[in-house]
Amino acid sequence: MRIAIFNTVQLETAGGMEHFCIQTAAHLSSLPGVQADCVTMDDAFNLRYGQLHSLYFLRLFDRSTIYRESRESIESRLGQARYLKCANFRELTQALGRYELIYSRNEITEAFLFHNLIGYDRVPPVIFGCHCPHRYIGASTLHSRLHNLLYTSPLYTRLAKRVAGFHTISGGDRAAIERQFPGYPVVQIPNPFDAIGYADQAKRAEAPITVDRAKFKILWAGRLTRQKGVAQLLEIIERVNESHADRVEWHICGEGELSRLVSEAARRHLNVHAHGHINREAMPAAYAAADLFISTSQWGETYAYTPREANSLGVPVVSYDISGCNEIIDDGVNGRLAKSDDEFVEYIKWFADGNRLGSDITKHIRKKTDATSAYRQLLRFFQDRLESESR
């Protein structure tokens, strides 16, 4: 079986979707009778796409954001899988035509591309993976509301109506897709995550951050954007520091349009450390150095990697009670789910005061995540859809 895992965004961008593409292609290609390759648009396309994307979000484009991981590192992680880049849509159509099935993200960009520029009838069956939330719950900003309007509109339904099926990751997205696309094959399978393997990486990696072992170390990691709750993070820091500044230190890993605000907070507070982007190979060691991980995402996640990564190192997590996070965190077991900013602050103080959850977090997350089972389910769905489409 030949599978193309397609994403317009190049793998060097090193986001969650790109990480999924690499891991999934590598695992599937290691199985007998399966060849899964990553296919993206080329560097020139990504530069233009990145500029337009930044313009849409009213921010300056930073070229470095599409080159966070080297091609050499990517190809090493891919194993037997290949990485193909296409310069134009004619070249892309030809490349995708060599496969039996295409797996693509559900972004409206890809839906428009397949419907208007390539043509669903000119390529093998396409499955959309909902790695972008189909609908943000509690959306409060202009862009999140516009996203919800677009993705639940007749326009998106028309652009995606020729897909062979949907792979959803969260329960919320599965329900939304089933309402909008009645009768379509929809499966919910969590993104594969190897908790044991991730913890092993921490033993081999050098710590990318320096910590004060006498302090309670709080880690935050992600893109510095409104969606990820940077404004809430900064407010939480201010409130916790009012009473616990001498006991805690904050380590913020990531970059984005709100990097300046984080840098300003680091200048204001001696216990706030802004580390910028940390490469994926080094992040396990950053989690291992922390006492608590916090996620301030606001509108829901399809698949929150960071809480699982933290848990795999035995680190508890505090997040808001939103979709994605509340499917990973069992409140009071491997972390706490806050229903308000006040609760979030109190949970952090509770941990900083020396309190601990009474469970084995590492053991718990290993039970909740089974990478082999997830890959098996995903491949079975691919096979079922291919058999159905060929009848």
What are these regions (language model features)?
Residues 330-342, 349-355:
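Conserved acidic donor-binding segment of nucleotide-sugar-dependent glycosyltransferases
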Residues 104-110, 130:
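Short His-centered aromatic/hydrophobic patch
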Residues 316-319:
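Short hydrophobic beta-strand element within catalytic cores of glycosyltransferases
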Residues 7-14, 27-83, 321:
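N-terminal strand-loop element at the rim of the active site
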Residues 172, 192:
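Carbohydrate-associated surface elements
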Residues 277-278, 286-290:
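Short alpha-helical donor nucleotide-sugar binding micro-motif in glycosyltransferases
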